[in-house]
C-alpha cells in the first residue's frame, strides 16, 4: 500500500438499507483492454436495477457505459453463446435471477465483437514495477468495521478508476517506476526535478549528438527524463535510460544504496561530463559551501587552519558513546562545530611554542551554499552486537532555518593565523575528504565528501562571510523506511509553484500536509506511516534540502513556451514517440493472439506458432497470414488450407467455418481476449480432396486398426461421430473409413490409461458408453477363434495391453576399448568382436554343465548353487512358445545373450596369466590371485565380483551356469558362513546403495514373466547421445523391472548385467544412475534417453567410495587414488584387505596392511581415524562417500576411540620457516598432556612452549609473515574441547614455537620479496584464508559507458 492510496473504497452505508437483502456480485473482466485481469466485487441491495448494476460496473472498471456486456459466469460451459444481461427493462437484480446471500459470478465481455471503450483516452504505459494497486480487488458495499491501513496523507482520491492508474496523477506530477530497488534513485531524481535552478540549468545545456553517444550521455538522459516528467501524460515513466547512461546493467537495479551516496557520485559524474561547458561550475555554484578546519594553541593563541569545501553537512543523530540523541537539527549543527580540546596524550605541537601544548580543534562555517543539503546520519554501528543499526530517534527540523548563528563572522579579524601547511595540522589530518569514509567511524562529527581546497581565495571568502542573508526554506525531505538491513526511500517535496507538499513515492504522487512532514521526525510518537507495524517507528527523514530565501536569486519553473529551441524539439520528439507507443498499444489492444497448429503436409510433423491477427481482419486474410507464418509457401497452395477451431489438449477439432471467409476474426473468435479457451489449426488437404465439415456437438474418434496375425497396430485414422449414434451405426461409420467388415468387427474403447472396454452392445449410444470430445478406439475384424474368448483372456486384449504399456527408449551403448574387450572376450583376445570359433567352443561345453557344477560345488564348501533350469543352456533371451517377448539379435555378435554371458564370465574366471592380467583401468572389483589353484574357484574372489555366471574346470574350459544361478549366493566364507546353503535375496531398495532382485529360471524377475516384451534395433540419428556412439531404439514393456531390462541388454552391451550401469538422461543432459533393480520402468516415458556405462553395478548395502591419499607434507596433500566398493557390515580391516591388490595394481602402492590407515574425509580435512575393528554400519555413509588413505611410517598407534590424533608443526621465527608435520597421539583432551607431548618431540622447555590452533582447511597454511602475530598463541584453556580451540576430533593442526626464539628482522626489500613469494605460494596451493565478510557493492557511475565497466572496477 502506498501513501495516500487505498484500493478498497468504502462509501457510507445507507441507514435504512440494513434490513434489505443484498446481492454479492463478483465481476471478472475477460476483455483484453487492460494489461491485467480486473476483478470487481459489488455488494448491492437486491432492489438495485440491472441498469444501475451496469452503471456501477462501468464506473469502477473505467469503461464507457454501454460499450460492454455482462454475462452469467456461474458454471457456464459456453460463455460466448449465452445471452447478455439486458439492462433496458426496468428489472431489479432479484427479478433478473440474482440470489441474495450467495456469490453471483458475472463476466464482463466485449459487446458485438467490439472491445469496451476506456473512460479516459489518455492512457500511459502500464506500471512495470509490479506494485500497481489495480491488481487488488475493488470492493463496493459495507465491509466489516476494521481499522484500515493508515496512510501518510489525509488526501484520498474519490474518483479512483482504472484509467486513473494509467493516466497522469491529478496532482499534475508524474511518478517514476521502481526498476527493482531503485527507490533511492527515484527520490533524488524527483528532488532535482523539483529544484528550479537545477532544472533550468539542465534545460540550457544542449546535447551535441556528433560528439557523444546519446545512450551514454548522463546529462542528455537526465534532460530527457525531466522533459518527460514535465510534459508526459503518463502516470509514471521508466528510468532505465538514465541508469543505462550510468553504465549499469540490470543487476544494478537489485542493489540498494544510500541516497546521499548517490547524490555525491552523480554530482561528480555530472561535473566530469560538463567540463568546458557553461554548466561546468553548476554543482559548486548551487551546492558547495566552505568551512575552516582549525587548531588553536591555548597558550600562545596561535592558530593553524585550512579551508575545506562541502556538498552536504552530515549531522549525528546520537553522539558516540551516548544513549541520548539530539532533539533537534539545530542541536546537531551546534555539536558539529563544537570544538574539542586536545590535551594529555593528544596535545598539539605548536610551531610558535615549539612544544606540545593544549589546543582547541574544530570546524567553522565560512560560507553556506545556495542549496543546503543536510544528511541525518541514522545508520550507525553497535559495538555491543557488532551489527549495523539504524537510529530511529526523534529529531525535529524547522520549515525555515536560520544559519547565521553557525557562521564564523570574526574569523577574518584574527591576526594570529597561519596557512594549512602547518605541520601540526598535517599530522592531525583533515577529517573531511572527497573519499567515502566508514559510517562506523568513532568520530561521528566527521563525514564523507567534503573536499580540500588548497588554493583558497581569501578575498572571496571574506565577501561571502559578509553576506547577511542566511535564511533557508525547506523544500525536500528524503525519507527512509526500514532498518539498516534494507528498506524503502521516498521523497516529500514542496512545490515552489503552489507551496503545496507532495509525496513522490516511486510511481505514486499524492498531496500531503505539514502534519505528514512532522511524522518523518522519527521516534514512536504520532500515527503510523508508510510501513505497517513492523516498520512503524522506522520511517524517518534521512536527507533534507533547503533553499536560500532570496527573491533576487530564487528561480521559477519554466513553462513550455519558455523552453529553449532544442528542448522544444526534444519535447516534440518525445511526444511523437509517446503517440507512436499509444498507437501500438491500441493495435495490441485490438489484436487476437492464439496458438496456431499445423500438421506439415510433407514432413508430417505437428508445427506450433503464435498467430496474431487484428480483430477486423477477415477469416480469408487470417488464412493467408497463417499460411505465411507456417512457411507453407511453395509447399501447398493457399486454397488447400483453412483455419478450424481446435482443442490441442484433447486433439479435437471443434468446428469449421464454412461460408464465413468474409467474417471478421473478432466476430468469429468472440472478441479480443487476453486468453482463449481454444486454439486454431491450419488444416490442409490434397487438391483432389474436399474439406470435411466440422459441426459443434460432434466428437472426434481416433481409430487404430489392429492386426492379430502380425501383432501390429496401425497409425490412427480420424473419424467424427455423434454421441447419439448407436454402436452398430458407429461400426458402419468406421467400416467406411478403414475398410473392415462391420459384422465381425470388434471395437475397444480406451477411456483412460489401462482402461479397455469392449463395445459389444449394439443398440447402446456412444454417450452411454462414455465417449467424450476426443476418443481413442481399437478395431479388429477377423474370423479367428479369438473372437469367442472372454475379452480379458483374448489375444486382442493382451496385444492392446502390451501396446498401452510399451514405451520407446533411446539407449546409447558404451564404446568398447581394447582393454574392455579383454574383459569380455577369450583369453588374450584384444578385439571386441568375438570369434565364431570361440562362440562354438562355448556352445560345445554346454552339455557338461551339470557334471561340472556338481564337481565345483564339492570344491566350494561355502557355496550353495540354486539351479532352476533343466538342461542348463543359460539362454535368457529365449522364451516359451506364445510369449509376447521378442528379441532382436545383438549388433555386436550374433550369438544369444546366454553365450555372451558365458564368454564374459569365462574370461573373468580363467586361470591367472601374465598376458591376461587386468589393467588398472579395466579391473573390476574382483581379482584373481595367481597363487590359487586353477582347478577351483576362490570364494573370496567371487564374493567381490558378484558377477560370475560361469565356473572353470581344471582344463580351463568354460562352464556355463544356468542363468537361474543367483550370484549373490557366492559369498566369502569369512563373512557369510551363516548363510551357507541359503540364497541371499535383496527385496528392499535402500537409498544411495545398490539393490537386487530375484530372477526366475528364464532370467526374468519373479512375478513379471508376462511383462517381458522387449524389442531392440540399431538406430542412428535423432535421439542418440553424442557422435559415434552405438545406439539402440528399444521398445519395452514399462512394467518390467530394471533388473530384467538390464538382462535383456546384456547381449548388446557384451557384459553381464552386474558389470554395467544404467543412467537416465534428462532434458538438461543431467545423468542420474538408476540403481533400484526391483523397480519397474513405469517412471520412464516415450523417447527417454538412457546411457549405458561399464562398471560394476552396486548391490544392496554396497556403496561406491572414493579413496584419496593423504600426503600431509606435500604441497597438495589430497590425491585421488581410485573408486572402491564398501558394504555395510564390513569391518575396516576387511576393506583394507580388499584395497591392497587394487592399490598395488592400479596405483603402484605396495603397502602392508598394518602400515596404512583409513580415516574420514570432510572436504579437504582429515577426520576420525577408522580403527581396524570398526564396522562401516556404524559410520555415517552416503552415495558421495570419500575416505582418506594415510600411509604410516610405523605400526598404528591409534588403538582406541578415546585417543586423539593431532598434527603438529613447529614455527621457527628466527628462520621464518615451518617444520614438517609430526603426529602425536593423545590419551586425553588435556592441554597439559598436549604440552608434554610437544615437548617430547621438540626438546623445547615446557615453560618456553607456546602453541596455537591452525585456521581454515587442512593443512591450515598461512603466510610466514603473518603466523607470528595473527594466530591466537597460548590460549588460556585447560582442555582441548574448550573455546577457542574446540578440538574434539582427529586431524586438528597445532602450531608451536619456542617463545625465547626471537623473530628475525627484515629490511623493507626483503619483506616485499618474501611477501610476493608467500602470496604466490598460497595462491598456488589455494590455501589462502580470508575472514572478511561480504562487502557491500560500491555505488559507481561509469562515465565511459557499459562497455568499459569492468576496467572501471577497483
Swiss-Prot record:
GO terms for biological process: base-excision repair; DNA damage response; monoubiquitinated protein deubiquitination; proteolysis. Residues 933-949 have a biased composition (Low complexity). Keywords: Cytoplasm, DNA damage, DNA repair, Hydrolase, Protease, Thiol protease, Ubl conjugation pathway. Gene3D superfamilies: Cysteine proteinases (3.90.70.10). Pfam families: UCH, USP47_C. Residues 114-133, 416-438, 863-882 have a biased composition (Polar residues). One of its GO terms (molecular function) is cysteine-type deubiquitinase activity. Residues 987-1000 have a biased composition (Acidic residues). The active site is at residues 183, 488. InterPro entries: Papain-like_cys_pep_sf, Peptidase_C19, Peptidase_C19_UCH, USP47_C, USP_CS, USP_dom. Ubiquitin-specific protease that specifically deubiquitinates monoubiquitinated DNA polymerase beta (polb), stabilizing polb thereby playing a role in base-excision repair (BER). It is found in: Cytoplasm. Residues 174-549 form the USP domain. The keyword DNA damage applies. Belongs to the peptidase C19 family. USP47 subfamily. This is Ubiquitin carboxyl-terminal hydrolase 47. SUPFAM superfamilies: Cysteine proteinases. Residues 920-930, 977-986 have a biased composition (Basic and acidic residues). The keyword Hydrolase applies. Residues 114-139, 408-438, 863-1004, 1314-1335 are annotated as: Disordered. It comes from the Eukaryota.
Amino acid at each position: 500500500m502506498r501513501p495516500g492510496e487505498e484500493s478498497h473504497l468504502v462509501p457510507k452505508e445507507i441507514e435504512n438499507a440494513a434490513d434489505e437483502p443484498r446481492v454479492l456480485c463478483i465481476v471478472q473482466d475477460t476483455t483484453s483492454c487492460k494489461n491485467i485481469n480486473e476483478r470487481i466485487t459489488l455488494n448491492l441491495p437486491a432492489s438495485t436495477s440491472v441498469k444501475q448494476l451496469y452503471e456501477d460496473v462501468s464506473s469502477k472498471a473505467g469503461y464507457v457505459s454501454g460499450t460492454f456486456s455482462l454475462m452469467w459466469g456461474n458454471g457456464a460451459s459456453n460463455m460466448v453463446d449465452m445471452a447478455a444481461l439486458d439492462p433496458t427493462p426496468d428489472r431489479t437484480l432479484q427479478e433478473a435471477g440474482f440470489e441474495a446471500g450467495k456469490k453471483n459470478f458475472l463476466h464482463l465481455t466485449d459487446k458485438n465483437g467490439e472491445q469496451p471503450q476506456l473512460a479516459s483516452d489518455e492512457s500511459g504505459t502500464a506500471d512495470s514495477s509490479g506494485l500497481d494497486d489495480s491488481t487488488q480487488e475493488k470492493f463496493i458495499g459495507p465491509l466489516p468495521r476494521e481499522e484500515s491501513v493508515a496512510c501518510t496523507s489525509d488526501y484520498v482520491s474519490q474518483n479512483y478508476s482504472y484509467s486513473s492508474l494509467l493516466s497522469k496523477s491529478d496532482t499534475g506530477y508524474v511518478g517514476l517506476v521502481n526498476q527493482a530497488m531503485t527507490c533511492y534513485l527515484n527520490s533524488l531524481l524527483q528532488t532535482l526535478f523539483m529544484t528550479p535552478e537545477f532544472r533550468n540549468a539542465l534545460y540550457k545545456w544542449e546535447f551535441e549528438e556528433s560528439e557523444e553517444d546519446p545512450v551514454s550521455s548522463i546529462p542528455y538522459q537526465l534532460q530527457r527524463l525531466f522533459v518527460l516528467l514535465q510534459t508526459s501524460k503518463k502516470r509514471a515513466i521508466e528510468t532505465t535510460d538514465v541508469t543505462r547512461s550510468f553504465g549499469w546493467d540490470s543487476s544494478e537495479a537489485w542493489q540498494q544504496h544510500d541516497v546521499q551516496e548517490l547524490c555525491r557520485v552523480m554530482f561528480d559524474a555530472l561535473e566530469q561530463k560538463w567540463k568546458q561547458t557553461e554548466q561546468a561550475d553548476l554543482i559548486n555554484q548551487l551546492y558547495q559551501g566552505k568551512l575552516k578546519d582549525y587548531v588553536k594553541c591555548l597558550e600562545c593563541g596561535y592558530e593553524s587552519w585550512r579551508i575545506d569545501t562541502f556538498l552536504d553537512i552530515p549531522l549525528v543523530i546520537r553522539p558516540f558513546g551516548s544513549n541520548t540523541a539530539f532533539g533537534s537539527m539545530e542541536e546537531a549543527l551546534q555539536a558539529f562545530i563544537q570544538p574539542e580540546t586536545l590535551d594529555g596524550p593528544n596535545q598539539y605541537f605548536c610551531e610558535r611554542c615549539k612544544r606540545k601544548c593544549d589546543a582547541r580543534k574544530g570546524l567553522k562555517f565560512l560560507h553556506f551554499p545556495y542549496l543546503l543539503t543536510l544528511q541525518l546520519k541514522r545508520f550507525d554501528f553497535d559495538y555491543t552486537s557488532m551489527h549495523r543499526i539504524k537510529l530511529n530517534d526523534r529529531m525535529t527540523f524547522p520549515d525555515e532555518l536560520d544559519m547565521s548563528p553557525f557562521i564564523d563572522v570574526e574569523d577574518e579579524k584574527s591576526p594570529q593565523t597561519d596557512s594549512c601547511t602547518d605541520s601540526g595540522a598535517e599530522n592531525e589530518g583533515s577529517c573531511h575528504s572527497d573519499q567515502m569514509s566508514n559510517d562506523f567511524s568513532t568520530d561521528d562529527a566527521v563525514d564523507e565528501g567534503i573536499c580540500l581546497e588548497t588554493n583558497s581565495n581569501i578575498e572571496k571568502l571574506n565577501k561571502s562571510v559578509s553576506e547577511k542573508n542566511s535564511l533557508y526554506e525547506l523544500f525536500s525531505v528524503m525519507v527512509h523506511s526500514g532498518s539498516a538491513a534494507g528498506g524503502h526511500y521516498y521523497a516529500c517535496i514542496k512545490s515552489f509553484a503552489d507551496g503545496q507538499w507532495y509525496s513522490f513515492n516511486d510511481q505514486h504522487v499524492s498531496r500531503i500536509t505539514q502534519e505528514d512532514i512532522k511524522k518523518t521526525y522519527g521516534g514512536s510518537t504520532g500515527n503510523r506511516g508508510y510501513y505497517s507495524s513492523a516498520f512503524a517507528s522506522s520511517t524517518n527523514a534521512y536527507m533534507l534540502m533547503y533553499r536560500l530565501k532570496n527573491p533576487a536569486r530564487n528561480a521559477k519553473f519554466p513553462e513550455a513556451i519558455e523552453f529553449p529551441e532544442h528542448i522544444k524539439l526534444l519535447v516534440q520528439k518525445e511526444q511523437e514517440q509517446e503517440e507512436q507507443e499509444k498507437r501500438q498499444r491500441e493495435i495490441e489492444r485490438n489484436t487476437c493472439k492464439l496458438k496456431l497448429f499445423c500438421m506439415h503436409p510433407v514432413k508430417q510433423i505437428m508445427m506450433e506458432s503464435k498467430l496474431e491477427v487484428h480483430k477486423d481482419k477477415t477469416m480469408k486474410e487470417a488464412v493467408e497470414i497463417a499460411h505465411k507464418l507456417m512457411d507453407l509457401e511453395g509447399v501447398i497452395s493457399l486454397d488447400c488450407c483453412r483455419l478450424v477451431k481446435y482443442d490441442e489438449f484433447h486433439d479435437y477439432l471443434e468446428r469449421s467455418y464454412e461460408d464465413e471467409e468474409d467474417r471478421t476474426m473478432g466476430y468469429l473468435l468472440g472478441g479480443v481476449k487476453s486468453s482463449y479457451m481454444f486454439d486454431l489449426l491450419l488444416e490442409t488437404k490434397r487438391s483432389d480432396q474436399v474439406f470435411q465439415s466440422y459441426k459443434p456437438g460432434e466428437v472426434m474418434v481416433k481409430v487404430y486398426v489392429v492386426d492379430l496375425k502380425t501383432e501390429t497396430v496401425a497409425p490412427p485414422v480420424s473419424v467424427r461421430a455423434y454421441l447419439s449414434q448407436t454402436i452398430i451405426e458407429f461400426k458402419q461409420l468406421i467400416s467406411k473409413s478403414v475398410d473392415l467388415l462391420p459384422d465381425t468387427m470388434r471395437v475397444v474403447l480406451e477411456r483412460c490409461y489401462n482402461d479397455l472396454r469392449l463395445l459389444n452392445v449394439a443398440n447402446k449410444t456412444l454417450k452411454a458408453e462414455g465417449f467424450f470430445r476426443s476418443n481413442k478406439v481399437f478395431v479388429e475384424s477377423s474370423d479367428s477363434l479369438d473372437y469367442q474368448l472372454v475379452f480379458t483372456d483374448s489375444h486382442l486384449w493382451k496385444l492392446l495391453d502390451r501396446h498401452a504399456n510399451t514405451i520407446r527408449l533411446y539407449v546409447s551403448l558404451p564404446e568398447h576399448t581394447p582393454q574392455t574387450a579383454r574383459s569380455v572376450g577369450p583369453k588374450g583376445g584384444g578385439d571386441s568382436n568375438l570369434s565364431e570359433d570361440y562362440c562354438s567352443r562355448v556352445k560345445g561345453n554346454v552339455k557338461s554343465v551339470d557334471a561340472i557344477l556338481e564337481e565345483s560345488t564339492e570344491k566350494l564348501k561355502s557355496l550353495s548353487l540354486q539351479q532352476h533350469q533343466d538342461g542348463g543352456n543359460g539362454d535368457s533371451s529365449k522364451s516359451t512358445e506364445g510369449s509376447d517377448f521378442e528379441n532382436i539379435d545383438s549388433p555386436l555378435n550374433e550369438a544369444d545373450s546366454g553365450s555372451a554371458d558365458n564368454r564374459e564370465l569365462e574370461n573373468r574366471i580363467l586361470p591367472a596369466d601374465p598376458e591376461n592380467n587386468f589393467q588398472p583401468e579395466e579391473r573390476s572389483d574382483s581379482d584373481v590371485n595367481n597363487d590359487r589353484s586353477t582347478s577351483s574357484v576362490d570364494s573370496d574372489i567371487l564374493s567381490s565380483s558378484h558377477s560370475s555366471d560361469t565356473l572353470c574346470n581344471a582344463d580351463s574350459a568354460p562352464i556355463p551356469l544356468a542363468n537361474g544361478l543367483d550370484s549373490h549366493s557366492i559369498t566369502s566364507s569369512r563373512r557369510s558362513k551363516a548363510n551357507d546353503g541359503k540364497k541371499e535375496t535383496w527385496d528392499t531398495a535402500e537409498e544411495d546403495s545398490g539393490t537386487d532382485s530375484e530372477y526366475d529360471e528364464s532370467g526374468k524377475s519373479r512375478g513379471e514373466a508376462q511383462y517381458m516384451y522387449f524389442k531392440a534395433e540399431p538406430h542412428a540419428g535423432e535421439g542418440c547421445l553424442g557422435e559415434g556412439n552405438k545406439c539402440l531404439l528399444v521398445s519395452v514393456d514399462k512394467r518390467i523391472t530394471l533388473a530384467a531390462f538390464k538382462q535383456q541388454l546384456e547381449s548388446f552391451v557384451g557384459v553381464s548385467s552386474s558389470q554395467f550401469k544404467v543412467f537416465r538422461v534428462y532434458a538438461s543432459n543431467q545423468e542420474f544412475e538408476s540403481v533400484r533393480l526391483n523397480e519397474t520402468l513405469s517412471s520412464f516415458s516415450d523417447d527417454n534417453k538412457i546411457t549405458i556405462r561399464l562398471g560394476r553395478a552396486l548391490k544392496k548395502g554396497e556403496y561406491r567410495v572414493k579413496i584419496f591419499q593423504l600426503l600431509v607434507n606435500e604441497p597438495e596433500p589430497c590425491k585421488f587414488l581410485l573408486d572402491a566398493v564398501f558394504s555395510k557390515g564390513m569391518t575396516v580391516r576387511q576393506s583394507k584387505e580388499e584395497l591392497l591388490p587394487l592399490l598395488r595394481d592400479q596405483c603402484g602402492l605396495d603397502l602392508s596392511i598394518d602400515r596404512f590407515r583409513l580415516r574420514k574425509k570432510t572436504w579437504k580435512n582429515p577426520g576420525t581415524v577408522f580403527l581396524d575393528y570398526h564396522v562401516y554400519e556404524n559410520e555415517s555413509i552416503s552415495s558421495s562417500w570419500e575416505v582418506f588413505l594415510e600411509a604410516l611410517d610405523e605400526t598404528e598407534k591409534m588403538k582406541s576411540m578415546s585417543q586423539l590424533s593431532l598434527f603438529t608443526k613447529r614455527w621457527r621465527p628466527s628462520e621464518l620457516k615451518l617444520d614438517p608435520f609430526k603426529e602425536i597421539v593423545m590419551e586425553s583432551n588435556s592441554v597439559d598432556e598436549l604440552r608434554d607431548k610437544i615437548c617430547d618431540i621438540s626438546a623445547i622447555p615446557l615453560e618456553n612452549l607456546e602453541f596455537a590452533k591452525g585456521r581454515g582447511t587442512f593443512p591450515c597454511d598461512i603466510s610466514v609473515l603473518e603466523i607470528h602475530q595473527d594466530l591466537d598463541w597460548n590460549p588460556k584453556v585447560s582442555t582441548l574441547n574448550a573455546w577457542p580451540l574446540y578440538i574434539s576430533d582427529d586431524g586438528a593442526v597445532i602450531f608451536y614455537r619456542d617463545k625465547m626464539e626471537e623473530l628475525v628482522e627484515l629490511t623493507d626489500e626483503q619483506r616485499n620479496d618474501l611477501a610476493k613469494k608467500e602470496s604466490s605460494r598460497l595462491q598456488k596451493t589455494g590455501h589462502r584464508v580470508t575472514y572478511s565478510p561480504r562487502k557491500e557493492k560500491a555505488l559507481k557511475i561509469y562515465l565511459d559507458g557499459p562497455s568499459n565497466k569492468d576496467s572501471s572496477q577497483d
